């Protein structure tokens, strides 16, 4: 029986970069998917941060 190949689409976690510097408690994280073949580097998207109440840059972690 053939082994199932690893999929190119993986789940990644995006975390707010500006929230750490603000010193406020809590964190803003989003879960999304990316295609491993097309996007080899880490994702960096602008998403809404409900704690800071504005759109901030979220970067892929781990």
Curated annotation (Swiss-Prot):
Keywords annotated in UniProt: Ribonucleoprotein, Ribosomal protein
Isomerase among keywords: no
InterPro entries (UniProt xref): Ribosomal_bL33, Ribosomal_bL33_sf, Ribosomal_zn-bd
UniProt keyword tRNA processing, yes or no: no
Entry's Gene Ontology BP terms: translation
Cellular-component GO terms for this entry: cytoplasm; ribonucleoprotein complex; ribosome
Pfam families, alphabetized: Ribosomal_L33
Single annotated GO MF: structural constituent of ribosome
Protein family (similarity comment): Belongs to the bacterial ribosomal protein bL33 family.
Name of this chain's protein: Large ribosomal subunit protein bL33
Species of the source: Bacteroides thetaiotaomicron (strain ATCC 29148 / DSM 2079 / JCM 5827 / CCUG 10774 / NCTC 10582 / VPI-5482 / E50)
Gene: rpmG
